[in-house]
């Protein structure tokens, strides 16, 4: 070994000795692996979430001002959104608190003490009153004031890892807020279109009741003229009573939906005044771009992903705790035994201290903390994998339901067209004077019944499509 390499080796020897003297790290747990869709999760949060909040407002595609207003009110006033927002602020404050530990600290302190010295103690000579010797005991009023500074050197990255873990939690909370936002918007939209479905059904039932009343009036006139018996109109009366009962049921459902919407929008002061609008048309098939790659837009997967990232940083921090801690301290103070001397230049004192803490034996505390961090990380990964599987199942189930209901709506549309042809034939025969007007009403009632069935199927498809939108994280576009 030449002289040029000998001295650097000697200089590094104390560092190697310190590292060798640290508490041993035990590898007792195997890290779990994440599901494949983890690679599809966008890691640009929370910026990406803010973009989703601005551009993926899927409810705007309905072009319904009432629905947009309800969802906006819910997002602004719902208690769930307020809770999610406070969780983000708490996580941000905790991250800032950890980040501040990585920088230098400077404090100012001052104290004054009045004390009587013991003549029999270690400071016994100061208990004497001998001005020639510099003692004026036994009473003294001493004072100290000045600056103290400290800096913990994060050589091994422990504090940086803790900050990264906290920032991961912040991003996870932001993703949870977006998930709450999507769930809230989906709940409001589903209730709103359920109300519109019931409102449309109410209109059809009123038309059925009108046709039934026409038949009842005709039967009564025929009975009064002695043309028919009273038995022939009984079935029509029963059907009319059933229709009125259905109307009452629909009105009750609409009131319940309005109450639930008021609760979601936190609107307890005034009743909702919704106006009926036409239901959106049923799409015959799912769009071509529908795929599991859209799962990356799900906010719950984003949140689970960031909890995993946070747990991995926590492991890094737990590992860094096995290495030595180095602290720098300095002070600049005025210290005097008598207050009258406190502000003299001779009362000034200063110093610099470098401290080293070497974890040699800790009874397994550091390894226990590392095991806890690894177990929590494995739990986060397992939760993420479970969320991925559930997300895939949610999409498959919702997509299948949407496709099935779309096919049912197509079949129902054909049934309604056939029923309308029967009504058209009856109307033509009435115009020709072959049948009475009540027979046209009798032909219209089955067609209206089929129309009511079609509205219910249309509402079910609409509800399923909103669920599919939620399963894809709000990124599915009809």
Curated annotation (Swiss-Prot):
Pfam families linked: OEP
Molecular function as annotated in GO: efflux transmembrane transporter activity; transmembrane transporter activity
Membrane topology: Lipid-anchor
Lipid-substituted positions (S-diacylglycerol cysteine): 22
Primary location: membrane
One GO location term (cellular component): membrane
Cellular location(s): Cell outer membrane
GO biological process terms held by the UniProt record: response to antibiotic; transmembrane transport
Residues of the signal peptide: 1-21
InterPro entries xrefs: OMF (IPR050737), OMP_efflux (IPR003423), RND_efflux_OM_lipoprot_NodT (IPR010131)
SUPFAM superfamilies: Outer membrane efflux proteins (OEP)
Coiled coil: none
Keyword set, alphabetical order: Antibiotic resistance, Cell outer membrane, Lipoprotein, Membrane, Palmitate, Signal, Transmembrane, Transmembrane beta strand
Lipid attachment residues per UniProt (N-palmitoyl cysteine): 22
PANTHER family in the cross-refs: MULTIDRUG RESISTANCE OUTER MEMBRANE PROTEIN MDTP-RELATED, OUTER MEMBRANE CATION EFFLUX PROTEIN
Task of the protein: Could be involved in resistance to puromycin, acriflavine and tetraphenylarsonium chloride.
Family: Belongs to the outer membrane factor (OMF) (TC 1.B.17) family.
Annotated protein name in UniProt: Putative multidrug resistance outer membrane protein MdtQ
Organism, as annotated: Escherichia coli (strain K12)
